[in-house]
Amino acid sequence: MKSRVYVRFDRGFHVICPYQAKLAGSRKNDGAGYISPLALKSPIGLQHDLEDGCRIRSAFGKCIVNSRFLALIDVRKSGFKERGSKEPHGNSFVYWVTYSFLQFFETTMDELPSGRGMGGRLPFNQSFWEEFLSGREGQLPTLPDISHVSKSVIRILGGNPGSMHLQGTNTYLVGTGRSRILIDTAQGLPVWIDCISSFLHTQKIELSYVLLTHWHGDHTGGVPDLIAQNSSLADKIYKNHPDSGQNPITHGQIFSVDGATVRAIFTPGHSVDHMCFLLEEENALFTGDNVLGHGFSVAQDLGRYMDSLRDMASLGCRIGYPAHGAVIENLPGKLEEYIQHREGRERMMLSALTRQRVRGEGLREEGVKCGLTLNEIVMAIYGKLPPEVIEKALAPSLLQVLWKLTEDRMVGFKPGDPLKRQWFALEQRKRNKARGYPS
């Protein structure tokens, strides 16, 4: 089944599932909805607005999600309040979401073009992504629902396998005694809470701490179920940028139980609040969504994400326990692969723009331009590709790289229609001047 979601920038921010556009008062009742991110306040959009953007985006994490179940969130006040699936009133900010594509929305909303007038539209073909990601999903190794991955770490799957979650969200019980640490709570599906509750009961295990790597719903969704099972856990939930009633996590904070000393490591980039956790007894790192067991992750802020990957590498941890996928037996190698992958893409794009600048300067009289549009950059690197591949698969990530190169003073752009925007490599002397270095 094909469906469309349209992206639009204006003064508001809401996500409307295409199936619910009519209920939410879409201008056209044609199965289309709108994603309307925060108004652009700088040439590089929301990259400089991460704190506010995180507050708005964190409404996603409040959704009680089962497959394609929809939730409506009212965020008019500083705290987010779940209102159920009622029709919106007045000027409420509302979120209609299909959970299967939360991470896609998360990675693209900063970079998609605003278009003409009050906002342009970029169609999102759901079937394209489902076909692309289902192929990757089919190649994954099978993981058991519960497995002892080390002497002090037990992995319990969240029961939410899918194209965006690989085999499902990994949740971890850490420690060797009766008292344990739980890292992440999965999506909030009944299969997970039933599984972990039964395991805790039969093994006579109690939870001393519940640590959340970040705000995304497939990591925080099980919190209400845990508290419903055991109300005393309400005081034991820890998260960076905590929600009401939760405890904060700070960089370097230590959480200790028998057989496990866990240190919190602030690693923003995938999300603004992302934390990893270092298990000192094993020299192992719970990598959250920054590094996955299979394939590559996505980043909200590419610059901070790259810094976090390097910070993670500097820890020297041997083993990685990712939030999705199998155990990473060679974490240093995986981190190097991630860094080289991202840096390689930066080098390719900068090289393409540099070649065009040199060519344009040499043939200026013949009308050869010095910059390239995004489509022309894709052509220079990958050759001719179908438009839907460029728009749906490449544009979001490549735009993210261009904005990072802009922040690094390596690339500039000419203002104008984002769809036709010219990007160009800065000369070395201009790069030095922009960075405050002597020419």
Curated annotation (Swiss-Prot):
InterPro entries, per database record: LACTB2-like_MBL-fold (IPR047921), Metallo-B-lactamas (IPR001279), RibonucZ/Hydroxyglut_hydro (IPR036866), Sec-metab_biosynth-thioest (IPR050662), WH-like_DNA-bd_sf (IPR036388)
| Keyword Repeat carried by entry | no
According to its UniProt entry, the protein's GO biological process terms are: secondary metabolite biosynthetic process
Q: Which residues bind Zn(2+) 2?
A: 218-219
Q: Does the keyword Magnesium apply?
A: no
Give one Pfam family: Lactamase_B
What is the annotated role of this protein in its UniProt record? Lactamase-like protein; part of the gene cluster that mediates the biosynthesis of neosartoricin B, a prenylated anthracenone that probably exhibits T-cell antiproliferative activity, suggestive of a physiological role as an immunosuppressive agent. The non-reducing polyketide synthase nscA probably synthesizes and cyclizes the decaketide backbone. The hydrolase nscB then mediates the product release through hydrolysis followed by spontaneous decarboxylation. The prenyltransferase nscD catalyzes the addition of the dimethylallyl group to the aromatic C5.
Which family, according to UniProt? Answer: Belongs to the metallo-beta-lactamase superfamily.
Protein name per Swiss-Prot or TrEMBL: Lactamase-like protein nscB
Organism, by scientific name, is: Arthroderma benhamiae (strain ATCC MYA-4681 / CBS 112371)
